[in-house]
Regions:
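Structured alpha-helical
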Residues: 1-189
């Protein structure tokens, strides 16, 4: 059995979106890579905050459940059609940047942040997002398993994958590997 200290406390899901954070009197924009009830992973930060705790607003996409949707309905969808919610809380950077020069900070690509005292509404929004993404990922994996030689099934698979943020042009084995990796990352290290 694996060491419980190495297990994640929360499920996490990819979130390719944006976040705004405040440092002093300035607002900065960053990319979000993944999200869990415990925190999120940011990239493309134009500025490493001077303080450890900062207010943040996250653009959270509201995916529908794709299972049971007809191919024509899925093909009509675009991520622009999905509702979005702006959720706000405070985060603490998990990694310390003390004793690093400003030049060293320029080369930092990712920053993990944990949520600091999120309110129940925020927690519910994150939980719902992660749970729904997980269900859609399981559905997408089931499409791989039942693929066979049916053209409609491949179209449905590629359409759902695209809506979840994957490149629909990838070769099927590579696409499956990426989806499987994200599925495995949902709950374990």
């Amino acid at each position: 059995m694996s060491d419980p200290r190495l297990q994640r406390k929360f499920l996490r899901a990819p979130l390719k979106s944006t976040a705004l954070y405040v440092d002093g009197e300035h607002v900065f924009k960053a990319r979000t890579l993944n999200l869990s009830e415990g925190g999120l992973l940011l990239s493309e930060l134009p500025h490493i905050p001077e303080i450890n705790s900062l207010p943040i607003a996250i653009n959270l996409i509201q995916y529908p459940r794709f299972q049971g949707m007809a191919l024509d309905d899925v093909k009509q969808l675009s991520t622009d059609d999905f509702a979005r919610t702006i959720i706000k809380t405070k985060v603490r950077m998990v990694r310390s940047f003390e004793n690093q020069s400003n030049v060293d900070k320029v080369f930092i690509n990712f920053i993990g942040c944990e949520f600091y005292n999120p309110d129940p509404e925020f927690k519910l929004a994150v939980f719902s997002y992660v749970e729904n993404f997980a269900k859609n990922t399981v559905y997408l994996l089931s499409l791989f398993e039942s693929l066979g030689n049916r053209t409609e099934q491949l179209e449905l698979l590629r359409s759902v994958a695209h809506l979840l943020g994957y490149d629909r042009r990838m070769k099927v084995p590579l696409l499956r590997a990426k989806v499987l990796h994200d599925y495995q990352s949902l709950g374990s290290l």
